[in-house]
Amino acid sequence: MGIRTYRPYTPGTRQASVSDFADITKPKPEKSLTTYKHNKKGRNNRGVITSRHRGGGHKRLYRIVDFKRDKYGVPAKVAAIEYDPNRNARIALLFYQDGEKRYILAPAGITVGTEVISGEDSPFEVGNALPLYKIPLGTEVHNIELVAGKGGQMVRAAGAAAQVVAKEGDYVTLRLPSKEVRMVRKECYATIGRVGNTEARNIKLGKAGRTRHLGRRPHVRGSVMNPVDHPHGGGEGRAPVGRSGPMTPWGKPALGAKTRNKKKASSRLIVRRRR
């Protein structure tokens, strides 16, 4: 994948860059693997905003991606690399030998015609899914399960990879992209390699319109609001916060305050917190 930049014809194109989509081999999705996804616009079941600054954007079909990789021992060939509007990573369309079709996250370096397989005795190759205890130390992995059989929950973003750093007893220790070091049960599955589309982080949207196209609405600063709307609001002109530190719109400490519950059971599995 490459990145295309534009000449400064307009203020929007001056800073903008886009993917060249050279890695895409199939323009339309597999119809049987798509479903309609309702745009909730950041609202819950009562219509109350629970996630601010969301709404609008282009309509999308959801691609049903196989995060479980539970078709053990059945080889599959990569039939196409496709665009997915719901994530930065590309997805790979697999044709299994028994006729089934599935999508997976496309690892970096995978191409049309590559054969992949999942299972305990799978060969050690990019795109294959194995239990963590079968994966050698130092290997880059992605789409990692936290609970065996539940499907991959960690390390799924474009360009992301975790590293296997230790094995001891029933647990395998991983270094995550955030530099957090944590233990995961050894029977949990992970996929060999790094998630593809590694250049996604370098793309610049360039203008507000492209951000709106993604379904993100303007993020208004609290300091320009009224006191009734935000703890930072009010005052004459540009006023300081007027509190011991910056606050969220609901009056809780922001910017640096730790939010993780200390009583969380999984805290004992975290060897080193993220930086």
Swiss-Prot record:
Keyword Cell cycle recorded: no
One Gene Ontology term, aspect cellular component: large ribosomal subunit
**Family annotation (SUPFAM superfamilies):** Nucleic acid-binding proteins (SSF50249), Translation proteins SH3-like domain (SSF50104)
* Keyword tags: Ribonucleoprotein, Ribosomal protein, RNA-binding, rRNA-binding
Region Disordered: what ranges? 1-55, 218-275
Question: SMART domains, from UniProt?
Answer: Ribosomal_L2, Ribosomal_L2_C
Q: What molecular functions are annotated in GO for this chain?
A: rRNA binding; structural constituent of ribosome; transferase activity
One Gene Ontology BP term is: translation
The entry assigns this protein to a family as follows: Belongs to the universal ribosomal protein uL2 family.
Name of the molecule in the record: Large ribosomal subunit protein uL2
Coding gene?
A: rplB
